[in-house]
UniProtKB/Swiss-Prot annotation:
This is Gamma-glutamyl phosphate reductase. PROSITE patterns: PROA (PS01223). Pathway: Amino-acid biosynthesis; L-proline biosynthesis; L-glutamate 5-semialdehyde from L-glutamate: step 2/2. It comes from Leptospira interrogans serogroup Icterohaemorrhagiae serovar copenhageni (strain Fiocruz L1-130). It is an enzyme of class 1 (oxidoreductase).
Length: 416
């Protein structure tokens, strides 16, 4: 099959399925999702075998430890995927929700309801759990989805899609509801971006190169899940009892994800900077330090200006020392990707100035940047974390996979 024929076939199947999905009852959708969650747990051995193939290929390609962690599935992560699907099933169905109802002076009745977007294409890298998260969210919100995962997770994604299709077939639902792009060559993506009549939205989530590639080539509206250069500022009035746990969690708990802190900003008036740097080093973090921090911890490496713009997705951290809140804010303005910024301080006025001065998808006070996540925000899961301002900003959950239709009922009215 030629490239364009392959693309149009997949897109047409998704479009056809989307017309059925939008009419499915909430109970039917929830039943299918709960069955999927059970099947993921029941067939975990098959999932692990497929994942082992990806891990083997990853080792041969010498992927970084952070990428290998993103790729890894184990029993705990499989059960976590199943749990996320159950959470999505338990969420209120946004489809049909009335967002506005009014009777006009001329007697016309207007009711605005949420409806599915239609066909959602998501392009992502490394993490196999995204296949299930996005598939479940799209299905619950009545959308068909076209999923194109990274080549490094091909076998894992393939088995996960297979299990999803088994449930759909059993329930007599078109498997075009969840379409898997089994071509890993990036050139195959471009024809998808021309299918303006078949795909309603494209969501890329991955590295800077992927985001740029999609944005430059797509004729379809793009919601960008851009890189997460997250800044964490430790104010001079920060509580030392909070600082180390927050910083360690923000960087170390899972460094290979977009809400992990990449830049640590230290006010030179904070008295426990040395202890903080030592605690990070003890956790295995490679510290890239400015001169002031390097004087406190000579075992670190000198930071380069370019480092402050990097999304490491690894146990690496750039450190910047400032002498004022204003200097910290100016630094963040230059380095932020618009994803997440956080401050640790006991001064409420400082916290207020910090949050009022910045323009990112999420701003945190006295807590870890790792909380910028759809599940943690009560959305069940997320399609991605949008760093743009249109159509959604921050975690993209169920409601953000909808648009609205206004239904107008009259009794013979005409416009004068």
């Amino acid at each position: 099959m030629k490239e364009i024929e392959y693309v149009q076939d997949l897109c047409s199947r998704a479009k056809k399925a989307s017309k059925v999905l939008k009419q499915l009852s909430s109970s039917k959708k929830n039943k299918i999702l709960l069955s999927l969650a059970d099947l993921l747990e029941k067939r975990k051995a098959e999932i692990l075998l497929a994942n082992e193939l990806d891990l083997k290929d990853g080792k041969e390609k010498k992927l970084s430890s952070a990428l290998m962690d993103r790729l890894l599935l184990n029993e705990k992560r499989i059960f976590s995927m199943a749990s996320a699907v159950r959470e999505i099933a338990a969420l209120p169905d946004p489809i049909g929700e009335v967002t506005r109802g009014i009777t006009l002076p001329n007697g016309l009745e207007l009711v605005t309801r949420r409806v599915p977007l239609g066909v959602v294409m998501v392009i992502y890298e490394s993490r196999p759990n995204v296949t299930i998260d996005v598939g479940a969210l799209s299905f619950k919100s009545g959308n068909a989805c076209i999923l194109r995962g990274g080549s490094e997770a091909f076998y894992s994604n393939e088995i996960l899609i297979k299990l999803f299709h088994e449930i759909l077939i059993k329930e007599e639902i078109d498997i075009g509801s969840v379409v898997f792009v089994d071509k890993t060559d990036r050139s195959f993506m471009i024809p998808f971006f021309q299918q303006t009549s078949l795909i309603d939205i494209v969501v890329p989530r991955g590295g800077e190169g992927l985001i740029r590639f999609v944005s430059e080539n797509s004729k379809i509206p793009v919601v960008k899940h851009d890189k997460g250069v997250c800044n964490l500022y430790i104010d001079q009035d920060a509580d030392p009892e909070k600082v180390i746990p927050i910083v360690i969690n923000s960087k170390v708990q899972r460094p290979g994800v977009c809400n992990s802190t990449e830049n640590l900003i230290l006010h030179n008036g904070y008295p426990f900077r040395k202890e903080l740097l030592e605690a990070l080093a003890k956790e295995g973090v490679e510290l890239l330090l400015d001169p002031s921090s390097l004087a406190l911890y000579p075992k670190g490496k000198p930071v380069k200006q370019q480092d402050y713009l990097e999304e490491f997705l690894d146990l690496r951290l750039s450190v910047k020392t400032v002498s004022s809140l204003e200097e910290a804010l100016a630094f963040i303005e230059k380095t932020s990707s618009g994803h997440t910024e956080a401050i640790v301080t006991e001064d409420l006025n400082t916290a207020r100035i910090f949050t009022n001065s910045l323009d990112s998808a999420a701003l945190f006070i006295n807590c870890s940047t790792r909380f910028h996540d759809g599940g943690e925000f009560g959305l069940g899961a997320e399609v991605g974390i949008s760093t743009g301002k249109l159509h959604v900003r921050g975690p993209m959950g169920l409601v953000h996979l909808t648009t609205t239709t206004t239904y107008v009922t009259g009794n013979g009215q005409i416009r004068g």
